[in-house]
Amino acid sequence: MFARIFIPKKHRQRFDEAVSQSLINRMCRSKSLGEPQNRLRRSRSQDHHERPQGSKRASSVPRDTGDEPAQNDRTLRKSNTMIPTQYVSGVNQRTIRVYRGKKSFGFTLRGHAPVWIDSVMPGSPAEACGLKTGDRILFLNGLDMRNCSHEKVVSMLQGSGAMPSLVVEEGPVDYPQSDSEPEETPSAPRSRSPALSSLQWVAEILPPSIRVHGRTFSQQLEHLLTLQERYTICKALETFFQHRNVDTLIVDVFPVLDTPAKQLIWQFIYQLLTYEEQEHCKTKIARFLGFKSAGNRKSGLSLTWTDSFPGPQFETYQQTVASPDSVDSNPYVSLDSPPASPLPSDELSPLPQRRKLFTFSRPPRSRDTDKFLDALSEQLGHRVNIVDDFKGGENDYEEMSFQDEQEVNMLPHELSSASSEDHSSSDDSTSVSYSSGSDHIPPPPQSPPPPPPPLQFTDSPSPLPITPEHLPQPPPAFQHHPIIAPPPPPPRPFLANRPSLHKVLPTREELRAQHSHPRRSSPQPSSQPILQLHQPKAHPILQSSPHTSPQPPHTSAQHTRLQHPSQSIYQSQQTTVPRTSPSLTKQKSLHSQPSQQSFEGTLSSKVPPPPPPPLPPPCDPPPLPKPSPKASDNNHMSVKRLRWEQLGDDPDYHKLSDMVKYLDLDLYFGTQRNSKPTFLPENLKKKDVVEILSHKKAYNASILIAHLKLAPKELRDILMTMSTERLEPAHIKQLLLYAPDDEEVKQFQHYDQDPAKLSEPDQFVLQMLLVPEYKTRLRSLLFKTTVQEKTEEMRAAYECIYKASLELKNSKRLAKILEFVLAMGNYLNNGQPKTNKTTGFKINFLTELNTTKTVDGKSTFLHILAKSLCQHFPELLGFSRDLITVPLAAKVNQRTITADLSDVHSTIQDIRTACVKIPATAEDRFAAVMSSFLENCHPAVQSLDSLQQRAMDEFHKVASYFGEDSKVTTTETFFGIFAEFISKFERALSETQGTENPKSPRIASPLAW
């Protein structure tokens, strides 16, 4: 479509309509030819929208060999090059031109490949041209948009111009496969998955050299998996590449690879992991397979890895939960526990009638699920959909039921059905994790097993005779339910006095179901499992008004438990619970006393003492739950919180939690200061050290001592012999800079204690002060090492001043230019060239010639001056060659070189005085060395004085020559004016010559001759 830019604007509308109609016709022909072969393999150029549509790398060919003629084969290739075969044209297509001008379109888009219009704003150009909600955008200005991603379509629409042409199709919105249920579209053709096309790069990420059983990664995916399974695998890998979370990858991929043949895909996935991630992945999957083998279900995985063995923690758990059925009702054992012991053979139904224990699948959409998603979307601020890569915080897997008739760990059908009255998903539930229907599978507990609490129960005011004889049996239809599973038991009960993070309450029907099942597999009829009743609150706002749902309002904040032998721990929901007010808790507790008394009376005659640890005596429920010992610890400061999604319990977590206690995380992330003073060990306490130098000076002196790498005695010898071989000028400057001042010298002289009590820099300075005339020796050493360099710099500076003064005074071409400037200025100022002439001007006006612009504003006075000199006085244009030293003299700082010369003379005088003051000895050679040095450098200093005198005399003369006061004007200011004038004149001259003489002159036309 690059030819569109060559079409005149008045004909572009017809061009767009013709192109759109042509594309639609070709699309229809492609459909009619492609119907006998509805499964066409897309070319790589169509799978990746980043490549141009005209790519010749591959073309679409029939997936299966057929009897079509070669002509139809070629037609298929041609049509599929421009129109992808995944799309089916319909009669609802229409071409619309949007006259938007500089406005926005006025609609919002959703989805990709193709995108569709989610909403149309009233009064917008989109509404004016007839676009409606649900229209799919197929073509934009003749360009195919059906395989493009959402971001690319948006960018193409933004650059589509003022009157873009759209080909849209009406009809219901087709959500991508990721937003729909895989069970609803099992027969979708492979060529109709644009979402899978966008993930094709994942299947091609491994090189073709990596093969298993003779096939590459993409070939094995296509050979072994269905369309939905391939999408799930690719989407899981794409998410893993972003977050590198192996646990999430296993949760997403493991349920798909559920056969020995499919599990070959793991060998390709391992190639994308690091060595540590491979070991972690193998360990996790071994736990899955180990649990399934315990349930008499062979995994058939052909890969090699080591299975995890039960440890001491598992033995403790087996002693605590003695029920053989508890493993079957706990979906977390496969993640957090080693393989359980096999079940007795009489407990299991025949193998062909049994379903697999644990699978990973998503629940079907229901009315309660939609309510839950709406509530969650309001909290999060954006729409939350059920997609395949949806990662629930805890419940990424669920449990399938056995075929047994009257299992005690089964729930009745009405408890798990989506249409249940007593246990429907409420609107205030905000848990991200959910299971089939409206039931929630709780995660493993987060705390070790505490001693059991007293037997207590809190229910609604109406008492119920809950006995196994009076309660009905569960309907047998539940055992054949393919999705709904009984809620699992946590391996360990919660603390009695600790506020739970996941508190739920069972309904009355749940309590009936718990006692209605006869015990079939219990070896000890007297033992009873634990039933936990929690408060089903999700929002932090506590509502005191009664709930309108048939579910009874349980508001007790205390964990109540009942002991039963062969039943699992039933929990209906899992939500976060705030603390209730004391008055409300007390009121609800009073209402629940009748049922509590009746229920306890029923159980008191049947419940024997549980195994150790023994139960504490029963007591009344407190008004508020007691805080945990960790929360009541006064030394535990408030720390920052980390926001994450909770996963299932890990058997190694408690070992890590014990180790974390010794990491001192409160010191790093604490938000409160501990009022108690911190006690430092003895070796870190500051000793009694005497400090005389200031803190900053002592710190810098310590750094200097480390750099010198000289002992105090060695430095003292250097100062006595005045040797310059081991000291750099920079070190001598720092020694002078950090030397003690007069006040500190007095403190050192009065110090009569042990020198070892002084700090290290103070000890160093104390030894240096024992050298007579310490600072004078340092200054003399510095002068001895730097005087030659200083004299050379000053000599060069004075020579520049001297030469520049002579050049300005003797330049004839500069004088001629200044006369021309004066004449032009007189003409402009007076109007007539011969009346009231000005005889001179200040030289600083030379820097302002470019500020006076011409009438048209295109040139300046300096440009006119350069142009006039080019035409009338071309010999004056090279005046800058007469002033070569002037730019160098402009950089000389007169004050600096004058101060340096004065410092040289003062230092020489101080050294001579010190030579007279310090007597010459065999050890102290200061006087002999420095006297000889002064005699040697005297001629150079005397020559420098003479040059300085001559340079300044010449400068005074040239300043007076140009009408400046030499006593006020400095050298850098004076020479800087001429240096700036030379630079600006050269620039204006080059601009003028460039305008008059262009680089590529054109030959005059013969017609102009």
Swiss-Prot record:
Pfam families: FH2 (PF02181), PDZ (PF00595). Keywords: Cell membrane, Membrane, Postsynaptic cell membrane, Synapse. GO terms for cellular component: postsynaptic membrane. Postsynaptic scaffolding protein. InterPro entries: FH2_Formin (IPR015425), FH2_Formin_sf (IPR042201), Formin_Homology (IPR051425), PDZ (IPR001478), PDZ_sf (IPR036034). Residues 629-1009 form the FH2 domain. Residues 44-53 have a biased composition (Basic and acidic residues). It is found in: Postsynaptic cell membrane. Residues 28-82, 170-193, 322-369, 414-635, 990-1009 are annotated as: Disordered. It comes from Danio rerio. Residues 322-332, 557-602 have a biased composition (Polar residues). Residues 334-352, 427-439, 521-535 have a biased composition (Low complexity). This is Delphilin.
